[in-house]
Structure formats: C-alpha cells, structure tokens
Amino acid sequence: MWGACLLLLGLSLQVCPSVIPVEEENPAFWNRKAAEALDAAKKLKPIQTSAKNLVILMGDGMGVSTVTATRILKGQQQGHLGPETQLAMDRFPHMALSKTYNTDKQIPDSAGTGTAFLCGVKTNMKVIGLSAAARFNQCNTTWGNEVVSVMHRAKKAGKSVGVVTTTSVQHASPAGTYAHTVNRGWYSDAQMPASALQDGCKDISTQLISNMDIDVILGGGRKFMFPKGTPDQEYPTDTKQAGTRLDGRNLVQEWLAKHQGARYVWNRSELIQASLNRSVTHLMGLFEPNDMKYEIHRDPAQDPSLAEMTEVAVRMLSRNPKGFYLFVEGGRIDHGHHETVAYRALTEAVMFDSAVDKADKLTSEQDTMILVTADHSHVFSFGGYTQRGASIFGLAPFKAEDGKSFTSILYGNGPGYKLHNGARADVTEEESSNPTYQQQAAVPLSSETHSGEDVAIFARGPQAHLVHGVQEQNYIAHVMAFAACLEPYTDCGLASPAGQSSAVSPGYMSTLLCLLAGKMLMLMAAAEP
C-alpha cells in the first residue's frame, strides 16, 4: 500500500524500493549512462551540406508537459515504468525553444503560429498566410499582405510538396502552407459572409486547389469540397456529413481535372492501392467529412493512421529527384486537450511520435532535414508526487485538503470543472482510467485554452545544428528555407548532399512489404463468406 512505501513530508518523497530497478541503485549505472551520452555528444558533427528534402512534423498543442506525459504513456504501453522511455523525437540531436506568441496575443492560436513557422512571419490571431497588417475578418486587408510559405517556395524550386493531417485539410495549421485568409474559419463559402465573397476573398478549400500545385493532400475535410447536400460517400444517410458548398462547385472534380495522373481516395484501401501505382502523380485522400477520428476510435480497416499517411506521402514525394517538402500535423492532440480528455490527447501524441519515427526511418539524415515542433502549448499539467510506474492517468498517492482524491493530470481551465452538490467530485481510479474521463479543471470553460509557454523544436539532418537556443517561432521557416537554399536564401553557399541519393532509406522495402501484406489480408477477409 502507498502508506507503507510513501512518506510525504513537505516536499520530501520516499519511493517504495520495489519500484526502483536494482541496477539504478548503483551509481555506476548513472555514471555509465551519462558517459555514453557525453561520448555521443562529443562525436556529434553538423551536416554542413544543403538539404534535398524538408520535413516538418507539428504536434498541435504538444507543449513540453505533453511531450513528457507522452513519453511516460508510450513506455507504459510497452510494459515499462515510463519516464525512462525514449520517444522518436528524443533521438534528434539538436533542439531549441520556440516563443509562440502572436503579434496581437500573448496566448496564441494555430493560425498565427502556423503562419510563423510555415511562412517565416509572425501575425495576428485567427489570420493565416498574411502579415500582421491584415485584420481578422476584414477581407479588404488581404491583398498586399500575403506572405509566402516555405512549401510554396519549395514547389517553385521544382520540389514535390505534400500536406498530411489528422484534422481537416482546411484547418489553420495545414492551411498555413497554402492559404491567405483573414479568417481561419472560412473552410468553404458557406462559412463566409456575403460581403467577403463580393469583395473577392476565397474560402480555404478553394485556395487548396487553386493557390499552388500540391502533390499529396491527406487528411479530413471532405464536406467542404462538395456542393451543399451532396451525400457523403461513407455516411450517405447522415445529412450533417453532406457537402456544404453554396457555389455548387465540386472542388475534388476540379482538382482531378487539373492533373492527368491525379487520384482521389476516401478510405485506407484506396489509399494503399493509389500509393503503389506509379502512374499516380497527385494524390488527394480525404478520409472523413470533417476532422479524422481520434486514434482510439479509428477503424484501421477504413481509415489510415497518421503514421501510414506519413509513409505514403514520403514514398510518393521521394520519386522527385529534386527532392520534396512535407508538412505533417498531429492535429487532434489539441482537440483532446480542449476537451480536457487527456487520454485522447496523449494517445494522439503517441501516434504522432510513430509518424515521427516513420519519417526518420524512411529518410536519410544526410539529405533530409526533419524538424519536430508544436504550434503552442495547453494549460495541461501533471503532478502530485506519483510513484514511478504509476499510470499517467492515475491518482495522486494522497488526498487533497478537501479530503478527496485527485488525478495527477489536471487542467488550469476547461469543461472538466464540475461540482457535485457544490463541491469537487471525489474521483476514483476506475473513473480516471476511463478513456472518456474529463480531468478536473480549476476554472469552468466550455473549451480549455492554449497556454503561452515556449515549445520545443527537435531537429536532425543538414543544417539542423542551426536549431539552438531560444528563438522566435518564425525562425523555424527561415532555418528550413536556408537549409534547402530556397528563397530568400538561394545563394546559401551550401554544397549539395553527397550522391543526391533517394530519400528513402534501406528499411523502406520492409515497410512496403508490410503495406502489401496488410492489403492482402484485407482482400482475403473480404472474400470470406
């Protein structure tokens, strides 16, 4: 029992000895680990060539506390104690902190932050792809204030480009790669005021297919691409999932007509088939009417995981000998936090790290720069002096001043603020372990808010050593542009990667065989009576 192995006196804590691995009781264990890390650090040398390929993976709302909690959860899922586990992003040798504020807000949103790290310019809250001279919801402040994304510059340089997300592809973060809008909510013309349409502003879905030639588009957001009332392919009887467009345009058909080798898919099976067909040069996969399902609710036979979408994108984009730019978003980490349902947020973050692992293993650090970061953090914390190895979703080992139990994970505000008979609920282990449990919050809000602390940047590959110290968030875009010698750094003076080989690493064939095996199993299952 906790009373037998936990002594809480002020800030002192004694952990039950049975929890501590025996080898960790010996100072030599820690000295050896530190010496190994020191040796690796001394051997670390910057890769001073240019980057043929650029990959940025962004965990929406993945603040440092979320990264740490994800590390613990991943370890516990693997049967370990948790904190000692290494995430894929932890393997990257270079890192920095990013200051996330918007030009007008101390606590930022995904539109302003996305514009910063994707375009290289900070801007106002709720504004995408425009400078801070633009004003939210004022259409006439759009023109002349556009800023250009690194992805757009990569395309101009002849590289292939792609966008992958677990949200809708019109969401503020992916939209930062291609759109210019004074309102992040203008997914289709149905969300826009008549005055904005009359003034010539375009909805984000229209900009997705018209602003630039994107080779791979994978995520959710189907209903914003089709005329109002068009039945959804997956949910034909659910009118809430039907098309929303008032202009009668079928943007998917318009996009297909632009490219001879274009393919549109809406489920995992079609995605795998299309990705293996080398005649497919452009791929759009929209797997849900709006955001994709949480990982814990995903039907693996119907919808691809973020890791699978990342693999498909890398494989297709790698066909271009001039290289590629890829943006990957683990977007529903943010949504889980807004709901104060930590189980959803952290399981999404574990899947996001799997996508990082895919990108890392499918590419070479000699020619591919990979950056992993977040747009902002959340008022998410975990504490309470829990025992090492205790569930990240579990209770603190002592009672609060009101005599009731509390979870290690708590939120500063949000819908988790609930009173029962005028008092805080006494939560149980069974309740806190439920995947739908809302952690308690200090202040009642319908949706938990972002927070303002710095977020981490992890980097590997050519010029990754430039990711260092504490930087403004827009620095990220400039590092990536410089590494690939893109505008405005075309005279970067960097040598090309040795050999200019394909980005896909030797381990790629094994993952391809796994995809093929999965497809065969699906076909066999479908053939059974």
From Swiss-Prot:
It is a lipid-anchor; GPI-anchor. It is found in: Cell membrane. Residues 503-529 form a propeptide. Its cofactor is Mg(2+); Zn(2+); Ca(2+). It catalyses: a phosphate monoester + H2O = an alcohol + phosphate. Glycans are attached at N140, N267, N277. Embryo and testis. In most mammals there are four different isozymes: placental (ALPP), germ cell (ALPG), intestinal (ALPI) and tissue non-specific (liver/bone/kidney) (ALPL/TNAP). Alkaline phosphatase that can hydrolyze various phosphate compounds. This is Alkaline phosphatase, germ cell type. It comes from Mus musculus (Mouse). The gene is Alpg.
